[in-house]
């Protein structure tokens, strides 16, 4: 099995787009890319826009040759109705989606999911609602958790976690569980016993606003439990990489992983690259170059459509 992170916060954008290849299947998970509309009360910097444009091209190119596309939920850094990533990537693909009607918040149920499904209408070879189901595709097994909360607050909606297995190994993509602040977030991982997990990490950059101290502490404890679950590799990237101090936040997890011989890494480091932290450094970027960014129309429309 080969795992290739395509776009993540450690690669300079908001995304969890990941390519997973088994012996007989190429699966693309959450093919979307976004930026924070505002951070430190600043709009995106030109370096962020350029990086998004660069990775969007890579993502579209990768999508041409995949067999399966998975959409774990309907936030704009996980799905795209055509703002930045053209919906033609779904042509002739088998598409697994989060249930657009059940265990879903109102903004996704009545606006985002319907718009997305209209945008890809008649393009996939087949669309399957995936929540809680298991599918055999060739010699590859793709399993989905029941819908679980998007972090500690169900008002943000629900996501489905994904386990992809061949005869050799299993990888879990947790989607936006925000570092597993609830015990229900752990159930799927404990059932599937993966060798590799891709997890987003807590919203520590919003501590004291959206995230409570006790929720952060529970996330870290539960991530420690995940590391103890027989894993070989843990890719922690997405929400927590929006915090410039992410390494300090995750130190307890790193420490336990080191003791157990588990590799804990960002998506960039998994690719043997230095993390390219842009959003968390936006103030610094504007101090270096204060010119307004030239934002393409599609990205401008995406940013105006709302965060998340």
UniProtKB/Swiss-Prot annotation:
InterPro entries documented for this protein: Metallo-B-lactamas, RibonucZ/Hydroxyglut_hydro, UPF0173_UPF0282_UlaG_hydrolase, UPF0282_hydrls
Domain of life: Archaea
Pfam families cross-referenced by the UniProt entry: Lactamase_B_2
Family classification: Belongs to the UPF0282 family.
PANTHER family: UPF0173 METAL-DEPENDENT HYDROLASE MJ1163-RELATED, UPF0282 PROTEIN MJ1629
Protein name: UPF0282 protein M164_2122
Top-level taxonomy: Archaea, Thermoproteota, Thermoprotei, Sulfolobales, Sulfolobaceae
């Amino acid at each position: 099995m080969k795992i290739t992170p395509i776009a993540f916060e450690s690669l300079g954008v908001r995304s969890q787009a990941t390519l997973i290849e088994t012996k007989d299947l190429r699966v693309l998970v959450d093919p979307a890319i976004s930026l924070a509309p505002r951070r430190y009360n600043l709009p995106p910097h030109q370096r962020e826009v350029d990086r998004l444009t660069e990775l969007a091209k890579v993502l579209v190119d990768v999508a041409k040759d995949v067999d399966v596309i998975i959409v774990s939920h309907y936030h704009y850094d996980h799905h795209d109705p055509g703002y930045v990533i053209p919906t033609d990537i779904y042509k002739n693909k088998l598409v697994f989606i989060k249930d657009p009607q059940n265990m879903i918040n109102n903004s996704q149920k009545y606006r985002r999911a319907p718009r997305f499904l209209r945008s890809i209408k008649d393009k996939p070879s087949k669309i399957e609602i995936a929540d809680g189901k298991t599918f055999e595709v060739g010699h590859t097994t793709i399993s989905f958790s029941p819908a679980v909360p998007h972090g500690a607050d169900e008002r943000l909606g629900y996501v489905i976690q994904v386990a992809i297995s061949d005869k050799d190994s299993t990888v879990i993509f947790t989607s936006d569980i925000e570092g597993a602040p609830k015990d229900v977030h752990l159930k799927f991982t404990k059932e599937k016993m993966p060798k590799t997990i891709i997890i987003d990490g807590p919203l520590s950059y919003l501590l004291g606003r959206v995230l409570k101290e006790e929720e952060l502490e529970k996330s870290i404890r539960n991530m420690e439990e995940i590391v103890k679950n027989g894993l070989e590799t843990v890719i922690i990237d997405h929400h927590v990489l929006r915090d410039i101090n992410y390494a300090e936040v995750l130190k307890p997890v790193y420490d336990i992983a080191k003791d157990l011989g588990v590799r804990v890494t960002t998506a960039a480091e998994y690719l043997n690259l230095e993390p390219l932290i842009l959003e968390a450094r936006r103030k610094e970027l504007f101090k270096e170059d204060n010119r307004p960014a030239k934002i393409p129309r599609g990205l401008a429309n995406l940013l105006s459509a709302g965060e998340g």
